[in-house]
Amino acid sequence: MKDIVLVFAGYDQTAGAGVLVDARTVTCIGAHPVCIVTSFVVQNTKGVKEVIFLDPSVIEKHINILDVKPKVIKIGVIGDEEAIKLVSKAIDLF
């Protein structure tokens, strides 16, 4: 089985950054990405219009249901202190 990389990152609809690029990069290095989306970035080729952070309870649900053990955790954009604490909890779990 391939090594698991747990990714916390935002979703960029232009695929120029965030979870889409992270997942592609993880795949390119021969590992398997497991991604938890932390935000949605409303943007186009001219720039970012808005960043919508997911409620920390949604992030927590995704953390709590994980049934794989990541070898690496990659952290991107995190919205607030509560979400940071949840990501820290995930690090402690693994």
Give the positions of each predicted feature:
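Ribokinase/PfkB-type carbohydrate-kinase core domain
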Residues: 44-94
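Short beta-strand segments
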Residues: 8-9, 36-39, 76-78
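Extreme N-terminal starter segment of soluble prokaryotic enzymes
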Residues: 1-6
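Short, contiguous strand/loop micro-motifs
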Residues: 9-10, 50
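Surface-exposed, flexible loop/turn segments at secondary-structure boundaries
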Residues: 13, 41, 81
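N-terminal basic/disordered segments at the start of proteins
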Residues: 11-31
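N-terminal glycine-rich anion-binding loops that anchor highly charged ligand groups
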Residues: 28-42
